Amino acid sequence: PATANSSGFSAYEEDYAREQIAQARESGSSIVIAYLHYGNEYSRSPNEYQVNISHQLIDNGADIVIGAHAHVTQGVEMYNGKPIFYNLGNFIFDQSNPATHRAYFLNLDLVEDNCTVTLYPVNIINYLPQFMSPEDGKALIAELNPQCDELQVSDAGTGKLTFKLGNTTNKTS
């Protein structure tokens, strides 16, 4: 494991995550984003472990959970009024599997206690993300959206979610 003085990995521990979220809130953070490297490679659906961890993080006060690792996109879920982006897909890899050539990135607009997240679908071509056509973008967002009715799709092929910031779900309060 990583320590203050040596490199390594930081395995998920709910108590430690709860403390970090609380510290962020106490220090005045207006938004808490949990970014995790988790999930099964090349699986288009989040596994039970991902779902459980993501729900715990939201329950403990995170505003957004963002995942990476699977090399493919996974679903989006609204849980207790907060978004979970299980896997964004690839950005710097250019693998031979066509499923790994699709990804999306997020833009967050923060206004007071409101957050609007815009999803921009991209294709990875020669290691470079290229915006998808509106039709392809709509198709990708439709794949992400069965778990998330709140995810709106624009004519331009982007997605949009709006939600309230702040800890409204913390079970420890």
Which sequence ranges carry the predicted segments?
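Acidic, metal/ion-coordinating pockets
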Residues: 1-173
